[in-house]
Amino acid sequence: MYQVGVDIGGTNIAMGLVDEALDVVQRESMPFEIKGGGERTAEIIHEGTLAMLKSQGAGLYDLDSVGVVVPGSIDPAGSIVINAYNLNFHNELLKARIQKQFGDIPVFLANDADGAALAELHKGAFVGCRTAVLFTLGTGVGGGLILGGRMFHGGLGNGCELGHALLVSGGEQCTCGNKGCIEAYCSATAIIRDAIRAMEKQPDSLLFERTMGKPERMNAKIAIDCARDGDSAALEVFHNYVDHL
């Protein structure tokens, strides 16, 4: 029997088919369609799952469960995405939508950093740990906390979510509507923003050359590659990023 793990990100939905030994035997990645909302997201998860199962000569009858994680706050019952700003999900009944696609197959919904920490606890760097913390750095910033060998969710289900804690008073605009959040400085989104600014200030930089000076062409990979190649503008972006982190 198999299980499916799904990571809904700000740009892609990453999926993995897991066997009984908890080893990933097949992967799938599909674009996240922000305009499609929760309903289209559930359809994409179903389509990707069928494709992975088919690659193994299997079908839904071989599927034990579906685990889905999102970069946002989940209600204590694990049913509703209260807020996931980078997905434009607000009080989204995501579990019910996904459950509708899979019928009687159990569906579980959790915060992405909590899911990552739990995975490390069972088969990763946290095996045998009683206390551990994990931070996810991507489109946003998330955190997962293990206390006493168990996942800590907190009274409101936010657990160790620090992405929207205040870092710089009156600072950069965040996707949540506030200013100065950790996420506004320590995410891939922040790297792209700062790389564009650096590129515009230094037209002789690799950042400018590799994007042809067009902001819409900038992404985190270009910024990282330029920094690795010694571009002073890109290195300054990452020095600031690390300082804030």
Predicted segment positions?
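Short glycine-aspartate micro-motif
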Residues: 3-7, 62-67, 108, 132-136, ...
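A mobile "lid/hinge" subdomain adjacent to the ATP/sugar-phosphate binding pocket shared
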Residues: 18, 185-244
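Glycine-rich phosphate-binding loop and adjoining helix at the ATP-binding site
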Residues: 38-46, 50, 61-66, 72-131
